[in-house]
């Protein structure tokens, strides 16, 4: 017979046919359940190797009833009985509760006699201590199984999934060691003998912990005040110096300035209301003209694209006539240049919207960033003004600064030359500092449109770009504004006489200016170490910005909770709503809001916050930490109990219950708004 259809534990279960009808018609046909006249049963029904079981430990506390369904038992498997007899037999103490429960039934005398007889039981473990614990804690699986109609073909085994579901239905408690038992009692681990589970000493139901399942999965870091330690605490002195090299000294002031620039709007009557899809034109206040070599009157505006709502920069050349319409298509290759050191152009077009012939170049938006000329060669007042966002003191052209500028400008030229283009315009006035120690070239692509097509080869134009970068570095190193190719040798000779000058930097400037066969690709190996330093500094700065970003994420999370509470607070349609009355389900939201924003009092003697006044006039305290703690615990939905009260009501609830109530009320509000309902229906 199949092992699943036989079990030695079935021999100690009273036969229900005998209880219902007085005799069992299958007693001579191999019925392996217990009968009153067991001696009259055939030998096949009483295998000598089978051990008896104490009925008290069977775990079936349900009384026998006349309404129990009848059954048709199957034959006992000799193979399973003989294999089970080899297991260790441990005597169990006989509790009284089960025998007394059986004695109250119709067959109480027989059950009492069977309970008083000495019996042994086959167990899966030899721990007698665990067996005693089993007598105290009744098996929840057995109680669940006793409530299910009996079927002989399914009485001995149940699947792991079924046993877990039965336990959940019976007492709604979690059985944490069910998987370990299934592996011990079933070779495959997929089937569990239900009756052996109820008698196994290793299976002891654990005491139920309230919401233990939720506690194991809850994000416990969300109910505390979310704080991120300053990143600089984890850096040594050298790393702090490297990071601050690229990080603005007053970053909050810089971020505020960027936000003000972004949201700045003005209505200027002399400007057109819109140009194509661009609108909201605002002149950019530049200290000096950033495009001085164009020989045209230039105006720069901040505009908003009506198609996507993003800001862009307008460069307008006034009184310009495009002689060759095909030249405007020269902007297309520049739209494909992607480099952090090149301000990308978007498009170019001619227009009469400014009441005169003009050509407009549209670039990606950037704030009013200073140029290198503003930082090093403008008047002291302008220099202090332009560098105030990045530096606490005016910037000086030290060796580290010059190498940083050189690596960025050479990287920009490498991206441009690799695209088959030439910058044609690199000067102190169109190289902008868009961040602390971060440079970007502005206005590229304009010369390709306004100039006639040149017969000069591309390699010669690219060589001029390298020369322009060398002149910029030489001007910064010698603190000389007007450095040209004719005066470069004299300035370079004077630079070599300075003791603090880096010899490798002088060699780089000399190669950039005077080497006629120079290609930008040949300079990259010499700049590799400085580019790696810049890369490491940028990564450290990225960690700092991530710290700031994490703080703003926490602020955003708490702001959303506050907004949700404010949407639900004191709405006029809730005045006559019974759910929001003092006896309604949503009244707890009002009590919780009062609990969060309560004004605590401080006893001068103990210096501890209290909610009751003392003999002396109490000191009021706006406890913001209490507010943040409540919001974090509400977001996490913790099980911490709090007292919500007013003059007439006192309610003890957990943050989890309050969170569920708030979410339900807010979803109901959203439903009414989506259905355009003023009151709840």
Swiss-Prot record:
Residues 38-58, 82-123 are annotated as: Disordered. GO terms for cellular component: cytosol; P-body; PAN complex. Residues 41-50 have a biased composition (Low complexity). GO terms for molecular function: poly(A) binding; zinc ion binding. GO terms for biological process: nuclear-transcribed mRNA poly(A) tail shortening. It is found in: Cytoplasm. InterPro entries: Kinase-like_dom_sf, PAN3, Pan3_PK. Signal peptide: none annotated. Keywords: Cytoplasm, Metal-binding, Phosphoprotein, Zinc, Zinc-finger. The keyword Phosphoprotein applies. The modification Phosphoserine is found at residue 165. It comes from the Eukaryota. Residues 96-106 have a biased composition (Polar residues). Its main location: cytoplasm. A zinc finger (C3H1-type) spans 9-38. Belongs to the protein kinase superfamily. PAN3 family. PANTHER family: DEADENYLATION COMPLEX SUBUNIT PAN3, PAB-DEPENDENT POLY(A)-SPECIFIC RIBONUCLEASE SUBUNIT PAN3-LIKE. Regulatory subunit of the poly(A)-nuclease (PAN) deadenylation complex. This is PAB-dependent poly(A)-specific ribonuclease subunit pan3-like. It comes from Schizosaccharomyces pombe (strain 972 / ATCC 24843) (Fission yeast).
């Amino acid at each position: 017979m199949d092992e699943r259809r036989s079990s030695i534990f079935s021999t100690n279960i009273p036969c229900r046919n005998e209880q219902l009808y007085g005799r069992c018609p299958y007693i001579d046909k191999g019925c392996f359940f217990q009968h009153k006249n067991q001696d009259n049963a055939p030998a096949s029904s009483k295998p000598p190797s089978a051990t008896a079981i104490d009925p008290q430990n069977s775990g079936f506390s349900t009384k026998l009833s006349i309404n129990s369904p009848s059954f048709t038992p199957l034959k006992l498997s000799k193979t399973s009985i003989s294999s089970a007899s080899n297991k260790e037999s441990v005597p169990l103490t006989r509790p009284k509760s089960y025998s007394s429960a059986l004695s109250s039934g119709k067959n109480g005398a027989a059950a009492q006699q069977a309970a008083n007889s000495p019996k042994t039981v086959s167990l899966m473990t030899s721990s007698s201590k665990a067996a005693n614990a089993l007598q105290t804690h009744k098996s929840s699986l057995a109680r669940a199984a006793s409530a299910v109609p009996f079927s002989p073909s399914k009485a001995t085994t149940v699947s792991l999934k079924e046993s877990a579901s039965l336990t959940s239905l019976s007492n709604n408690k979690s059985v944490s060691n069910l998987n370990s038992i299934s592996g011990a009692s079933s070779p495959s681990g997929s089937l569990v003998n239900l009756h052996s589970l109820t008698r196994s000493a290793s299976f002891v139901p654990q005491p139920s912990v309230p919401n233990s399942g939720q506690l194991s999965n809850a994000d416990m870091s969300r109910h505390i005040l979310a704080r991120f330690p300053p990143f600089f605490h984890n850096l040594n002195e050298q790393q702090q110096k490297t990071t601050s090299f690229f990080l603005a000294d007053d970053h909050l002031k810089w971020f505020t300035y960027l936000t003000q620039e972004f949201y700045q709007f003005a209505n200027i009557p002399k400007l057109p209301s819109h140009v194509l899809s661009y609108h909201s034109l605002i002149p950019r206040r530049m200290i000096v003209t950033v495009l001085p070599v164009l020989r045209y009157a230039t105006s720069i505006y901040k505009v908003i694209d009506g198609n996507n709502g993003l800001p862009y920069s307008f460069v307008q050349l006034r009184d310009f006539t495009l002689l060759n319409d095909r030249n405007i298509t020269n902007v297309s290759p520049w739209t494909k240049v992607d480099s952090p050191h090149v301000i990308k152009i978007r498009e170019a077009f001619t227009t009469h919207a400014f009441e005169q012939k003009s050509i407009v170049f549209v670039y990606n938006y950037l704030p009013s960033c200073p140029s290198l000329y503003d930082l090093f060669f403008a008047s002291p007042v302008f220099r202090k003004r332009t560098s105030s966002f990045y530096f606490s003191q005016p910037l000086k052209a030290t060796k580290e600064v010059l190498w940083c500028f050189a690596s960025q400008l050479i990287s920009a030229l490498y991206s441009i030359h690799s695209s088959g283009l030439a910058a044609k315009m690199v000067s102190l006035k169109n190289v902008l500092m868009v961040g602390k120690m971060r440079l970007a070239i502005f206005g590229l692509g304009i010369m390709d449109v306004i100039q006639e097509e040149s017969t000069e080869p591309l390699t010669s134009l690219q060589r001029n770009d390298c020369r322009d970068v060398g002149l910029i570095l030489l001007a910064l190193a010698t603190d000389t504004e007007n450095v040209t190719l004719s005066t470069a040798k004299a300035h370079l000779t004077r630079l070599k006489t300075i003791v603090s000058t880096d010899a490798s930097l002088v060699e780089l400037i000399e190669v950039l200016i005077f080497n006629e066969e120079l290609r930008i690709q040949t300079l990259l190996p010499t700049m590799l170490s400085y580019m790696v330093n810049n890369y490491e500094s940028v990564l450290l700065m990225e960690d700092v910005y991530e710290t700031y970003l994490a703080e703003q994420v926490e602020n955003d999370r708490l702001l959303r909770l506050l907004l949700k509470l404010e949407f639900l607070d004191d709405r006029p349609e809730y005045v006559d709503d019974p759910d929001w009355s003092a006896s309604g389900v949503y009244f707890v939201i009002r009590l919780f809001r009062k609990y969060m924003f309560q004004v605590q009092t401080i006893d001068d003697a103990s210096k501890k916050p209290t909610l009751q006044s003392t003999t002396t006039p109490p000191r009021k305290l706006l406890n913001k930490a209490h507010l943040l703690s409540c919001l974090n615990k509400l977001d996490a939905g913790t099980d911490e109990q709090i007292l919500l009260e007013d003059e007439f009501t006192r309610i003890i609830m957990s943050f989890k219950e309050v969170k569920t109530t708030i979410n339900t009320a807010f979803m109901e509000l959203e439903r009414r708004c989506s259905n355009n309902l003023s009151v709840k229906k």
